[in-house]
């Protein structure tokens, strides 16, 4: 298992960042395409939601596992990556009018000894996601 993490400062209040990223059915920026495959509980965007997320040429299927408003959610990637297992968590920490965005993932790659490469690619996708948030909302 490979553990990956990333921390970014976003120049938006935590409530705004949460409103942009917590609904699994809505895209926070035009560069991020979301197709809902299955609605969650209690409604679309809730636990159990399955979506296809596209950022550039990267396409992954994700399922939302937990939501803890207004600061964290966890998810799994269930398709589109060279992994046997991928469990991710996003946590937001408010600091005055900014947000510290924490991302953590435990990744088990299909090919042994490639965890570092998979982690590097995942970090690139997460950075692109955060960059898009900042570009369109700050």
Regions flagged by a language model, labelled:
Residues 100, 106-138:
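A conserved amphipathic terminal alpha-helix motif
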Residues 26, 36-81, 132-138:
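Glycine-rich portal/gate segments that line the openings of hydrophobic small-molecule binding cavities
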Residues 12, 81, 94, 107-109:
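Beta-strand elements of well-folded, non-transmembrane domains
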Residues 11-14, 66-70, 91-100, 138:
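A short, structured loop/turn motif at beta-sheet edges
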Residues 6-8, 60-66, 86-94:
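Hydrophobic/aromatic beta-strand elements that line small-molecule binding cavities or substrate pockets
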Residues 1-43:
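Hydrophobic ligand-binding cavity/cleft-lining segments
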Residues 64, 77, 94, 103-105:
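Residue-level recognition of conserved beta-strand positions in structured domain cores
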């Amino acid at each position: 298992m490979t553990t990956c993490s990333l921390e970014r400062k976003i120049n938006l209040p935590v409530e705004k960042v949460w409103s942009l990223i917590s609904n699994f059915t809505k895209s926070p920026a035009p560069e991020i395409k979301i197709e809902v495959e299955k609605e969650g509980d209690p409604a679309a965007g809730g636990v159990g939601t399955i979506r296809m997320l596209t950022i550039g040429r990267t396409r992954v299927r994700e399922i939302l596992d937990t939501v803890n408003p207004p600061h964290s959610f966890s998810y799994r990637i269930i398709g589109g990556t060279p992994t046997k297992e991928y469990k991710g968590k996003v946590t937001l920490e408010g600091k005055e009018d900014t947000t510290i965005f924490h991302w953590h993932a435990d990744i088990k790659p299909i090919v042994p000894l490639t965890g570092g490469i998979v982690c590097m690619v995942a970090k690139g996708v997460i950075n692109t996601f955060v960059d898009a948030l900042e570009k369109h909302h700050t």
